[in-house]
């Protein structure tokens, strides 16, 4: 048999295997352990957060409504329901987020979320190659008792102006921005912000 024919055949076979493997990798779902469901965002996006001292640009703006899956793949919609909202955007691989979650949960356990406030964790920037994946296992291990939603494609984070973790957005009952914060908040500051929000 012609040597060149054998070489050409081997090249074709190698390419075919590479294509087959490539298709398998591309078609593989993100992860079977992640919640499933469509995320939708409606309304004008908030400007990207710059700093606490320079955030007047967002204060008073109406935040977009959104729907996303919870840890049980049930679609939850965040919209006007008569309650104010405290949203904390978390990345499972973020060390600051890993410190913040138990601080917030301890406050909830000891004092409780004030009446009239929905406290919502939004897991975003999900990466199965990094620490604490999947995020719902991490939150379960931390004993998180409040609503948890999954921003699988970072659509909600983008719409809310996230640029660092952890990222807090406080909304009044009409979904207008009251305050935004980034970084670890001490437990007393978390409490002050929640109480102030309840008194809006």
Question: Where do the PLM segments sit?
Answer:
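Hydrophobic beta-strand anchors of alpha/beta hydrolase catalytic cores
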Residues: 86-87, 119, 168
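Structural microenvironment flanking redox-active thiols in thiol-disulfide oxidoreductases
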Residues: 98-142, 152-159
């Amino acid at each position: 048999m012609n040597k060149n024919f054998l070489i050409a055949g081997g090249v074709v076979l190698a390419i075919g295997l590479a294509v087959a493997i490539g298709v398998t990798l591309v078609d593989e779902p993100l992860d079977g352990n992640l919640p499933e469901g469509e995320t939708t965002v409606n309304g004008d996006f908030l400007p990207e957060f710059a700093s606490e001292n320079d955030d007047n640009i967002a204060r008073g703006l109406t935040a977009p409504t959104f729907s996303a899956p919870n840890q049980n793949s049930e679609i939850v919609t965040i919209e006007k329901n008569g309650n104010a909202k405290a949203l904390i955007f978390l990345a499972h691989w973020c060390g600051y987020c890993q410190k913040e979650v138990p601080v917030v949960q301890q406050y909830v356990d000891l004092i409780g979320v004030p009446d009239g406030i929905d406290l919502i964790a939004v897991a975003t920037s999900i990466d199965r190659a990094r620490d604490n994946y999947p995020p719902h296992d991490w939150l379960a291990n931390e004993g998180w008792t409040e609503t948890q939603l999954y921003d699988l494609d970072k659509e909600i984070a983008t719409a809310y102006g996230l640029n660092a973790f952890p990222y807090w957005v406080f909304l009044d009952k009409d979904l207008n921005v009251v305050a935004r914060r980034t970084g670890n908040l001490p437990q007393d500051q978390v409490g002050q912000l929640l109480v102030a929000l309840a008194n809006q």
